[in-house]
């Protein structure tokens, strides 16, 4: 699976569990951390965990294993690191506080309108 395909598969997984404000940022031209960041907002800590678990399971089913998972105990922000793609699932407050969209403002947004269902 290419990094872009992996990012889009993560979007599908997050959307399937009603993740909100899903965004994909292409970051490969800015950093060696990852080619893509996938950002998603949840409405509760329970949903943060459910979104992260669903994303991890669906990508594992495609043969993609995260190299690192961070934040399960805290629940306000879970990060799934698939090397070329990093998935961030936030509570709204955490997403506003860390404001990765501002931090990575030079990243290229990826159009996911064909994947994400309107709320």
Kindly label every feature range from the protein language model.
Residues 1-24, 28-29, 43-50, 57-60, ...:
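Long, contiguous binding/interaction regions
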Residues 32-35, 81-84:
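A short, glycine/Asx- and small/polar-enriched loop/turn
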Residues 39-41:
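Short hydrophobic/aromatic beta-strand micro-patches
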